[in-house]
Amino acid sequence: MNTFLIDYRDIQTPKKGFSGLFNDYSHEGQMHDKLTEKFFHFDYLKEADYYKHLNTLVSRSFRRKELAELLIRQNRRFGTAAKHLESIEKALSPRCMFVITGQQPGLFTGPLYSIYKALTAVIVAERQKAMFPEYDFIPLFWIEGEDHDFEESATTSIIDAGQIQQVSLDPWKRLPGQMVSRSAMGPGITDTLSDFTSMLQESDYREQIVSMLQEIYTPDSSLELAFGKTMAHLFKDYPLIFLSASDPDFKNLAKEIYYRELATCPHTSHTIIEQSSLLENMGYQTQVKPRAVNLFYVNHHDQRMKIEQSSADSFSIVPDRHRYSRHQILEMCDDHPERFSPNVILRPVVQDHVLPTFAYIAGPGEISYMAQYRKTYEHFGLKMPFIIPRGSFTLIEPAVRRTMDKVLQKTGRLTQSRKQLYHTAFHDLRILQKKAISGAENHDFDTLLDRTEKNILAELEALSPTLGKLDPNLEQVLAGSLVQIEKVMTGIRQKTHRAGRRKHDELVAQLDKAAAGIFPEDLPQERVINIFYYLNKYGWGILDAFATMLRAHSSESHIILEL
């Protein structure tokens, strides 16, 4: 497998590329230093900060026994390998910390980036253990099952016959705003799974994949449970564990954050607005808009409902509009923390209150909005963990690689490397397409044919005086031959042009197909395609290949991996 690295700052082809804030944060330099100083508590590029954060976590108290019991119970349900269950007991020690990543549940695991996040957490935990052998670091995947965007969770994409095909699960007996973790998939999952697996081509791995998915994706299961079981199976050889934050026992561990948010709101929103203003003054765009109350209320149908603060001491739950005093809503929180759910602002605060989080592995979008949270953490008496960019890949299949080789031939740049070609493709795919098509049209054939015809006619005409002396009739024969030669050359030109157009059309089609594989729907591949397309074609070992690449390379570059 060949590997090439592309600087994130050079990737401009997808319509949703990487933000300026992410580019500055993920590259060592002056802008990175400014960002970490103003918007984060620790710099993942500075070794000294690792010692500071270790001391911070060791000095804090956590409800480790309750946390470990919860994790063991949940991971047994997800089917996590027994050897990884044993590692959870290390969490009882104050010298054990977590490297966390997370995502909402995805259908058949969803886009590739969930896999890359999980592997990055594993690799970062390995590195920290090597740096600090007296400590333990457990990689943990936070399953955001409280998310209520069912459509996003219940949709995935796969490549079938060179085309991107979307597969979706229709909601079954589901109410608006209902948490994904509480929604049974229903009988429709049988047809959805059949549609998905029918697009997996015959291979040595297909039968095993289909059998596994059929066992996990059943009508009575939820997307969250199926996602956790699938991920646990894929990562059975890696020490990754899982956490569902919708668990009532977890809510009890998080109650202090919910209570403080309700007791002090709208202070959290003020901290976000203050940080956002600083970011905007530096020229960055902000993503998260705070609410007066950054919690949802979960009703008895498991629907997340907005909590609105109508006055300093008055709250209402939308849409029923029943009013509560601050004292009443605080009592509700104290008695039933399972009825509250954090929004995107409070979620990481809850995470880092309950768990001793050494690092969080974040995607580009997450890093952009985490930059808005420093003062929010301080409001809750916490420090942010290290925020480390996840690994990022584009997978190049053999057919795409062959197309790239043809492009090198057509552009006449055989000395140019494929890395340079990929660089052009990721910077501006249209430029690469224009160069390749221009080379395929190959106007030099006309020049060559004109020169050849001119030379043949000139040589034959030079024979005319000699042949005329020998026999005058031969001059007429020669004249007729010259006319025939012109007709023959015209025919050759026409056939050459037709062949050139065919080559042109073939290359255009191949380039379009290659572009669809690299940038499906004009988006980064990792945000669209499902991992099982690649597992089915290339085998389970592809996960090990990803891990090897992540161990070898920093997170400052996007990895192009030729399969």
Swiss-Prot record:
GO MF term list: ligase activity
EC number: 6.-.-.-
Record keywords: Ligase
Enzyme class: ligase
Keyword Ligase found: yes
Record flagged with keyword Coiled coil: no
Coiled coil segments of this chain: none
InterPro entries: Bacillithiol_biosynth_BshC, CC_BshC, Rossmann-like_BshC
Similarity remark: Belongs to the BshC family.
Listed NCBIfam families: thiol_BshC
Protein name as annotated: Putative cysteine ligase BshC
Organism: Chlorobium phaeobacteroides (strain BS1)
